[in-house]
Amino acid sequence: MRSPRDPEETAWHQVRRLGYSPDDVRHIFLTHLHLDHSGGLPDFPIASVHIFRPELEASLRPRGLLRWIYPHEHWAHGPRWVVYDAPRPGAWFGFDAIETVAGLDPEMRIIPLVGHAPGHCGVAVRTDKGWLMHCGDALPFGGLASSPPEAISRLLIGPHVPRLRALALEQGERIRLLPAHVPLQKLTGWKGQVET
């Protein structure tokens, strides 16, 4: 997988295209801190960065190959970490969940999906059309329809694909699941189903 090389694809430029200033970004919820997910943090120096404690701890003390995956220069500017612990078992459609900081709108949950990274999480947001859950790298790039064989899936992205598939089937239009690395145009419009 390659990181975007076109500056227009960066979050900073996308925020500007939407008519906002990067200083308007007050909160960033990361699924994990791998280099391909945290590279834009310095572009939003005043934002609070929300993260699950096991992921922050793994990134601050990486060992072996993880030193390359967790580049400290992405958070050398000293972000304001908002660190989450202790998910409530089964609190969100049977998944363990953590309620985010009180007062944030819309309602959000952090859903631990550990496997791809030590503290990997999904981020679920309640919308007027149901829940939208950014599954990060716990879901294959092409969504559930493109799942690799289970053994490969478990090795690369963790053990959650079968549960996420069951959630999508049980809840239908009430929950929309999105993988990481989805082109921006795929994020527009409500399909009422898992993105494929």
Give the ranges of each region predicted by the language model.
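Short hydrophobic/aromatic-enriched beta-strand-loop microsegments
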Residues: S48-R53, H134-G136
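Metallo-beta-lactamase
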Residues: R2-Y20, D24-D36, R53-I111, L155-R174
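Active-site metal-binding loops of divalent metal-dependent hydrolases
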Residues: L33, E55, G115-A117, D137-A138, ...
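Active-site-proximal beta-strand elements of phosphoester/diester hydrolases
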Residues: M108-V114, M133-G136
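Short, conserved loop/helix-junction motifs that constitute active-site signature segments
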Residues: P42-P45, H74-W75
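Active-site beta-strand termini and strand-to-loop segments that position acidic
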Residues: G103-P106, A124-D128
